[in-house]
């Protein structure tokens, strides 16, 4: 038996940024029938991170309320390239890459969604059947002026940055997906609002009942400033090793921890409020953060892995111990320390290496080093550490 409309709305509203139009959503729920809930993901990279799961978690909530989940893999749109938030044309992917990435998506999302209650669809199923005439008719449903209302398009137009015609097609294709699927609600990030509303417009144009839209916040990365992104290296990947996932969660600020609880945890709001009260009354935020780390690792791995990661964390970080196992490297040439750190994968670039040394975040056998340009000559099995979580055993035989 489905929950009351009021009970469902309480779940739906949790963490949501905006619901359009809320009155229409309530009327849809009053019908007492499972609604079609759509969310699209372009398989532009093989691995998902926790930022992606904000939407997937909301899909799971709808699923638990008894609604039908349409997990749309945008294999067709991925070959266009989503221009949302981009200051330049985004290169499209090959069909081979798209299909390969799509397979990994299915494997990863079912760590959250119930596969038996999830319908996975590919928008190439209907988009590849449209003729040139059909695409021209679709393009005729909107205007260039409407497209330029989108912030990114408008800014690029004002700055004389080229906008390719195929980029205008992206929101139209995403909107047409809603027509093809007869979706009742579409979910997306706040940066997708224009595209979601295009779905409403096109459904009305084709004589269908307009979908409601629900936007979720963009999750900040580990730095607490920019959106979580693999390219910014401020992400926690779904496929990260348990120990890495644990360490990354523990590295977030105490303030950001509550944001992660709200958007990533399946704990009730009452439970989270209890955690906040505990911290306000003197509980160490670290203890609460551990609960979040354990929950996420258990979700994406298993309980045993979560417990092992906690034990490793306590050994490695709480006691400032150097782990027994770490990557080992042998180099046959003398190079400056910053370059060595980059070659060993301890930093993302030599400039990052210089910066980390300057910040006092680099240690050699437990002792801080201060000269990032000092040449590293013949040495054997020296332990280098960057930050709290990165270690490597390095030999230089020049």
UniProtKB/Swiss-Prot annotation:
Catalytic activity: tRNA(Tyr) + L-tyrosine + ATP = L-tyrosyl-tRNA(Tyr) + AMP + diphosphate + H(+)
Localization, UniProt: Cytoplasm
Chief subcellular location: cytoplasm
Family matches, as PROSITE patterns: AA_TRNA_LIGASE_I, S4
Alphabetical list of SUPFAM superfamilies matching this protein: Alpha-L RNA-binding motif, Nucleotidylyl transferase
Motif 'HIGH' region positions after renumbering to this chain: 43-52
Pfam families noted in UniProt: S4, tRNA-synt_1b
Top-rank taxon, per record: Bacteria
Keywords, in A-Z order: Aminoacyl-tRNA synthetase, ATP-binding, Cytoplasm, Ligase, Nucleotide-binding, Protein biosynthesis, RNA-binding
Entry's EC annotation: 6.1.1.1
Recorded GO MF terms: ATP binding; RNA binding; tyrosine-tRNA ligase activity
InterPro entries, A to Z: aa-tRNA-synth_I_CS, aa-tRNA-synth_Ic, Rossmann-like_a/b/a_fold, S4_RNA-bd, S4_RNA-bd_sf, Tyr-tRNA-ligase, Tyr-tRNA-ligase_bac-type, Tyr-tRNA-ligase_bac_2
One CC-aspect GO term: cytosol
Residues covered by the S4 RNA-binding domain: 335-396
NCBIfam families for the chain: tyrS (TIGR00234)
Record function comment: Catalyzes the attachment of tyrosine to tRNA(Tyr) in a two-step reaction: tyrosine is first activated by ATP to form Tyr-AMP and then transferred to the acceptor end of tRNA(Tyr).
Subunit structure: Homodimer.
Entry similarity comment: Belongs to the class-I aminoacyl-tRNA synthetase family. TyrS type 2 subfamily.
Name of the protein in question: Tyrosine--tRNA ligase
Lineage: Bacteria, Pseudomonadati, Pseudomonadota, Gammaproteobacteria, Thiotrichales
Gene for this chain: tyrS
């Amino acid at each position: 038996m489905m929950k009351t409309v009021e009970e469902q709305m309480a779940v739906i509203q949790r963490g949501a940024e905006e619901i359009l139009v809320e009155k229409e959503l309530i009327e849809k729920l009053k019908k007492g029938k499972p609604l079609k809930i759509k969310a699209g993901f372009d398989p532009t990279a093989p691995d998902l991170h926790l930022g992606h799961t904000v939407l997937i978690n909301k899909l799971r909530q709808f699923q638990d309320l008894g609604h039908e989940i349409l997990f749309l893999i945008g294999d067709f749109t991925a070959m266009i390239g989503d221009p949302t938030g981009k200051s330049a044309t985004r290169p499209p992917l090959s069909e081979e890459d798209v299909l390969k990435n799509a397979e990994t998506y299915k494997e990863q999302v079912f760590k959250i969604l119930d596969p038996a209650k999830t319908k996975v669809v590919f928008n190439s199923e209907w988009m590849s059947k449209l003729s040139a005439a059909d695409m021209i008719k679709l393009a005729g449903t909107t205007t260039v002026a409407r497209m330029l209302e989108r912030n990114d398009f408008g800014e690029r137009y004002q700055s004389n940055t080229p906008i390719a015609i195929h980029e205008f097609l992206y929101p139209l294709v995403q909107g047409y997906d809603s027509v093809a699927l007869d979706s009742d609600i579409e979910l997306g990030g706040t940066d997708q609002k224009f595209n979601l509303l295009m779905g409403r417009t096109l459904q009305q144009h084709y004589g269908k009942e307009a979908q409601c839209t629900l936007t979720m916040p963009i999750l900040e990365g580990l730095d607490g400033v920019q959106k979580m992104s693999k390219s910014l290296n401020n992400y926690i990947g779904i496929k990260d090793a348990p120990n890495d996932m644990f360490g990354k969660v523990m590295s977030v600020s105490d303030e950001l921890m509550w944001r992660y609880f709200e958007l990533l945890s399946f704990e009730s709001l009452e439970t989270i409020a209890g955690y906040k009260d505990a911290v306000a009354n003197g509980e160490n935020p670290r203890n609460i953060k551990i609960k979040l780390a354990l929950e996420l690792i258990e979700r994406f791995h298993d309980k045993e892995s979560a417990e092992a990661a906690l034990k490793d964390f306590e050994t490695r970080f709480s006691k400032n111990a150097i782990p027994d196992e770490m990557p080992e490297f042998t180099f046959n040439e003398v190079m400056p320390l910053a370059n060595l750190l980059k070659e060993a994968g301890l930093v993302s670039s030599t400039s990052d290496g210089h910066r980390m040394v300057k910040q006092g975040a680099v240690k050699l056998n437990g002792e801080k080093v201060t000269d990032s340009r000092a040449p590293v000559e013949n040495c054997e099995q020296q332990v280098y550490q960057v930050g709290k979580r990165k270690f490597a055993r390095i030999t230089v035989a020049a």
